[in-house]
């Protein structure tokens, strides 16, 4: 139940729920398991770490759309959890059922924290890698980059506002999709 996770339960509360018979590895009909719900509802990182270590969960467990926990941590911009999962050996290049890796999943969903992307780059993600349709992280992130801080950061990693994807789309095209006229 997602509402449970919105209360930010600590590890002791989760342990008590497990003792009552709740399964920490159970998934709903859409393959969102307990840990995914905890991540997506911004439960405390220590609680999430505890859940990952429970039987039936692991850093390689497939969830909704065949995503691993690293996808969800990146999607939420949870840098601390991203760093933890990478340190535990989570695959930074693992692609979900849509061909999306954690870093481009984060960029496509508006995450712009340089510290999180640094963790991916230090773990071996090529900053200038081309993702779906030949788009790089700057192009994927630009629609949500209201102050262009992400674009500035990505430009230090070899990307540019002048980059073009495989279909000829520019940063302007990607930004226009957001409907933000000022951007």
PLM regions: where:
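Sec-dependent signal peptide cleavage junction
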Residues: 1-21
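Ankyrin-repeat boundary/"N-cap" motif
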Residues: 1-5, 25-39, 60-72, 95-107, ...
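Ankyrin repeat A-helix N-terminal signature
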Residues: 5-9, 37-44, 72-78, 105-114, ...
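Short amphipathic alpha-helical segments that mediate assembly, nucleic-acid/protein binding
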Residues: 14, 31, 44-45
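Generic detector of contiguous secondary-structure segments
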Residues: 14-20, 36, 77, 81-92, ...
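Ankyrin repeat domain, specifically the short helix-to-loop turn at the C-terminus of the second helix
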Residues: 15-23, 49-58, 83-91, 118-127, ...
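Long, mid-chain structured domain cores
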Residues: 64-108, 112-124
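Solenoidal tandem-repeat scaffolds enriched in leucines and small polar residues
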Residues: 110-183
């Amino acid at each position: 139940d997602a509402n449970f996770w919105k209360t930010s339960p600590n590890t002791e509360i989760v342990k008590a729920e497990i003792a009552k018979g709740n399964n920490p590895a159970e998934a709903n009909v859409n393959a969102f398991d307990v840990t995914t719900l905890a991540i997506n509802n911004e439960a405390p990182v220590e609680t999430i770490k505890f859940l990952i270590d429970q039987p039936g969960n692991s850093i390689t467990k497939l969830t909704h759309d065949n995503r691993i926990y690293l996808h969800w941590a990146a999607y939420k911009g949870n840098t601390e959890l991203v760093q933890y999962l990478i340190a535990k050996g989570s695959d930074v290049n693992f692609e979900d059922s849509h061909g999306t890796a954690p870093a481009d999943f984060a960029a496509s969903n508006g995450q712009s924290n340089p510290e999180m992307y640094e963790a991916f780059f230090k773990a071996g993600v090529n900053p200038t890698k081309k993702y779906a349709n030949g788009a790089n992280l700057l192009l994927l992130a630009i629609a949500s980059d209201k102050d262009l801080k992400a674009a500035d950061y990505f430009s230090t990693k070899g990307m540019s506002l002048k980059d073009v994807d495989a279909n000829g789309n520019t940063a302007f095209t990607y930004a226009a999709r957001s409907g933000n006229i000022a951007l």
